[in-house]
Amino acid sequence: MKKAAAQLKTYRAKRDFTKTKEPSGARKVLPAEHRRFVIQKHAASHLHWDFRLELNGVFKSWAVAKGPSVDPADKRLAVEVEDHPLDYGDFEGTIPKSEYGGGTVQMWDRGLWAPQGPKTPEDALAAGDFKFVLAGERLKGSWVLVRIKNNRGPTSARFHRRTHLWEWCLRSRRNRADGSRPRRPAA
């Protein structure tokens, strides 16, 4: 778990744990036999949904504008944010407005996920084309995160202007088997 501790350096640097009830990551949470995911509705300065996938002892995390959509035609901006500790998967509460991410965090969905395709999750993320399956309470099925390219050439990708982290597109990969359009989950 030494690697996970190093991955949480940015997360810890942004927070004052004497003021926020967010988990510091000090509590040991063993990796699950099957990888977990959580989606938390986060009413911060801008309402968004925090999308987290367990990988290598941390939650890889993205802030998703408008929340995930089950309609494959809907593409959602997903700004990569710092890795979060695994105990964040149980966090709900209010972060003080004066703190980073100030606002209310509510559990929106949780479950298990598995990678799709021949690449490891690490290689797929590095390549900028990461396919996976979710088995959650609200979201089920095949999804993809694609790193957004900018107009500076085929190998360039966009960074978020504030976080300097990658911008991605999150979308569902398929309609339902009966061909009907999926309905959007209630917010």
Question: Which residue stretches match the model-derived regions?
Answer:
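A charge-rich, low-complexity, intrinsically flexible signal that marks solvent-exposed coils, linkers
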Residues: M1-A187
